[in-house]
């Protein structure tokens, strides 16, 4: 069980989505955007940092479960100035999460779309629709918030798949242990995989 915060960074609007994962089940907790209407970049970065800090602290305060964070990686924009601003916004988001001692995983837009839609070149509307289906939402979230939720879903799928893969390979894996060339799991190992 875990809470996952997904972030879609942007210099004018940063989307976030928060889900609860229990095994294969994903449940919506929260989503929204942090708007930075000011023209000055330092003020925008401050708002992103403070907004994500406030949202994350709320969930840290009211949850006993571990919190994971996932952030969309920067794509190469045609305009270098846009790419730089996006990178700065992403840095402010990551700094807010790391300042609260969260581990941050990063995913490309293609990885997120592939995980959520099954197609790495899906458009924003397709991502919104699939987020609604996966989380059983009655109301379609705003695009940036849906992208934040999609990032969280991607992390849930990735971490759950990795745990299953680890469990299967560990149970069936062959190693160089002295006991018939098979790995042996202790109760502690099994508990750590849950």
Curated annotation (Swiss-Prot):
Which GO molecular-function terms appear in the entry?
crossover junction DNA endonuclease activity; DNA binding; magnesium ion binding
Residues binding Mg(2+) 2, per UniProt? 72
Q: What's the EC number here? A: 3.1.21.10
Q: Does the keyword DNA repair apply?
A: yes
One GO CC annotation, please? cytoplasm
Cofactor(s) of this protein: Mg(2+)
Q: Which reaction does it catalyse?
A: Endonucleolytic cleavage at a junction such as a reciprocal single-stranded crossover between two homologous DNA duplexes (Holliday junction)
Q: Where does Mg(2+) 1 bind?
A: 8, 144
Q: How is the cofactor bound?
A: Binds 2 Mg(2+) ion per subunit.
Q: Which family does it belong to?
A: Belongs to the RuvC family.
Q: How does it assemble?
A: Homodimer which binds Holliday junction (HJ) DNA. The HJ becomes 2-fold symmetrical on binding to RuvC with unstacked arms; it has a different conformation from HJ DNA in complex with RuvA. In the full resolvosome a probable DNA-RuvA(4)-RuvB(12)-RuvC(2) complex forms which resolves the HJ.
Q: What is the documented function of this protein?
A: The RuvA-RuvB-RuvC complex processes Holliday junction (HJ) DNA during genetic recombination and DNA repair. Endonuclease that resolves HJ intermediates. Cleaves cruciform DNA by making single-stranded nicks across the HJ at symmetrical positions within the homologous arms, yielding a 5'-phosphate and a 3'-hydroxyl group; requires a central core of homology in the junction. The consensus cleavage sequence is 5'-(A/T)TT(C/G)-3'. Cleavage occurs on the 3'-side of the TT dinucleotide at the point of strand exchange.
Q: What is this protein called?
A: Crossover junction endodeoxyribonuclease RuvC
Taxonomic classification: Bacteria, Pseudomonadati, Pseudomonadota, Gammaproteobacteria, Moraxellales
């Amino acid at each position: 069980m875990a809470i996952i915060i997904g972030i879609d960074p942007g210099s004018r609007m940063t989307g976030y989505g928060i889900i609860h994962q229990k095994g294969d089940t994903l449940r919506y907790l929260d989503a929204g955007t942090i708007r930075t209407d000011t023209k000055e970049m330092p003020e925008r970065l401050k708002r992103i940092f403070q907004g994500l800090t406030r949202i994350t602290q709320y969930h840290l305060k009211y949850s006993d479960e571990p919190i994971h964070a996932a952030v969309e990686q920067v794509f190469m924009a045609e305009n270098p100035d846009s790419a730089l601003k996006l990178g700065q916004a992403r840095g402010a988001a990551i700094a807010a999460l790391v300042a609260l001692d969260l581990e941050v995983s990063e995913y490309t837009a293609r990885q997120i779309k592939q995980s959520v839609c099954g197609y790495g070149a899906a458009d924003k509307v397709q991502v919104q629709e699939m987020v609604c289906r996966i989380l059983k939402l009655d109301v379609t979230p705003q695009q940036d918030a849906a992208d934040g939720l999609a990032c969280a879903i991607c992390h849930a799928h990735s971490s759950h798949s990795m745990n299953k893969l680890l469990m299967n390979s560990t149970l069936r894996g062959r190693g160089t242990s002295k006991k018939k060339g098979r790995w042996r799991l202790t109760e502690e190992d099994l508990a750590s995989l849950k």
